[in-house]
Amino acid sequence: MASKSRNPKAYCYEHPRPALTVDIVLFHRSGSVLLIKRANEPFKGLWAFPGGFVDQDESLEAAVARELEEETGLKGIRLEQIGAFGDPGRDPRGHTVSIVFGGVVDRSIQVRAADDAADAAWHSATRPPKLAFDHKKILKLALKRLADSAKQ
């Protein structure tokens, strides 16, 4: 059976929709978290989690893998969904909903900044630099999830 191509104009919505993004919180067993320094506005020069917009017809998992590789050079890292953040004011460009993925690595990993990241580096997870967007709130949830999983 031939697959039907999707017509994007077949269904039109009368209300605006938020943009969908992904963010990646990657911890190292040493107690550090991977951050990128933003090269572009908004929040140019501030640290943030690797992440970005989900492309049309792209799965969340594919977007996470693409963004992590584009911004840090990392591939093949095991990640799982840990939450969603959708406050309408979280991004000055407009309403975005971010699906957050997290993971832990225990080996030494070299990262390199690329794409729209001016820098990529490991920072203290408990005393990070000033973070862009609502990433401080995201970090707090990720640390809680990490602590909860360590208790199990």
Tell me what each language-model feature is:
Residues 20, 43, 95:
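Exposed loop/turn and edge beta-strand positions of beta-sandwich/beta-sheet ligand-binding modules
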Residues 16, 41, 89-91:
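A short beta-turn/loop motif at secondary-structure boundaries
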Residues 54-80, 85-146:
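Unchanged
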Residues 18, 47, 121:
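Residues that recognize and position ribonucleotide moieties
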Residues 146-152:
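Compositionally biased, intrinsically disordered linkers/stalks adjacent to structured regions
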Residues 1-23:
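Acidic, metal-coordinating catalytic segment for phosphate/diphosphate chemistry
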Residues 31-70, 74, 152:
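Conserved Nudix-box catalytic region and its N-terminal flanking loop in Nudix hydrolases
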